[in-house]
Amino acid sequence: RGVEIRGVVDKDIDNKSYYRDTPKLEKIFKAKIRDDFKYDLETKKILSKKKYSENNKCQRPEDTEGPLQCFEGKGYASKNPFPFKGDIMHNKFFIIDNQYVWTGSANISDTGIGGYNANNVVVLDSKFFAKYYLEEFEQLYSGKFHRRKAVARHKDISKKIDSANISLVFSPKGYAMEKIFPIIKDAKQSIDIPIFFLTHNAVSKELVKAHNRGVVVRVIIDSTGASNGYSKHQYLRDNGIKVKVENWGGKMHMKTAIIDQKHIIIGSMNWTKAGVTKNDENTLIIKNSSSKGLQLTNFFNDMWLSIPDKWLDEDTKAESHDSINSCTDGIDNDFDKLIDNKDIKCL
């Protein structure tokens, strides 16, 4: 009916998308869909010339081959090396008629918005925010992905809507964690975090500091995220913070924090170094929204109670009888290319 549709999707260095239906979308809209394939190839060339020396200040975990990271005297590493496959265009937002913005953690997929994965989104009716989302989109559409985008460290994109103060920050050039830290540091009573990946060192330290000054901190982390060799969820546990690993077949895919039941951090960015410094992301910081904060707190409580307390101390396996429905859902929940009863953990 005449609506102009443009889009940007993520591709890796093999010119492949995570979703197999992406080529269909590209075929329908032809030149209106663009991607970061060429940029990732250029980045690969640059990275191939760099030499990396291993940090020897901590002990490497057994049976690991990935880059060694030292944090608080402990070594972290992935089981397998991970060659560069491309930075990620990880945004999930729509701008409609320069007025409305739909954004959050949900991929437009059967599992992402079909109720299987845990996600949340925000809908903004605001020409102000639509303008800045459009500026970000135009950068991506013109080929300025990831580290090529304009630096926006000191850019303040904020507006009061009703009683809430809303701020917007884009990664990787907006230095998102610098905007998130003050809210965590100012927390007085509670911090609830439902999240997919939590590997960021500095934010992990800030959560422990909050716990030590009496703030009640709770974290729900995805099973796959917990299996990541750089995950800091056990560090949080070791320092007294309650962390539950979800035992659902679907993913805990949110990237959210609710502070004092009235401040909300929500968006596409996982709390990881890559999320902050490499991937294209957007994050909304919503302050003083007691109604939405209470709504999200209640939702978090429901999720928290749905996970047995057993998983406060142990980690579930994403594709196993630990995780409800994961052995019968037809999905490769742990990304090992083995589905349901073809995975030994489901036998």
Regions found by a protein language model. Name each.
Residues 1-4, 201-211:
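Histidine-anchored nucleotide/phosphate-binding helix
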Residues 3-185, 213-263, 267-291, 312:
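HKD-type phospholipase D/PLD-like phosphodiesterase module
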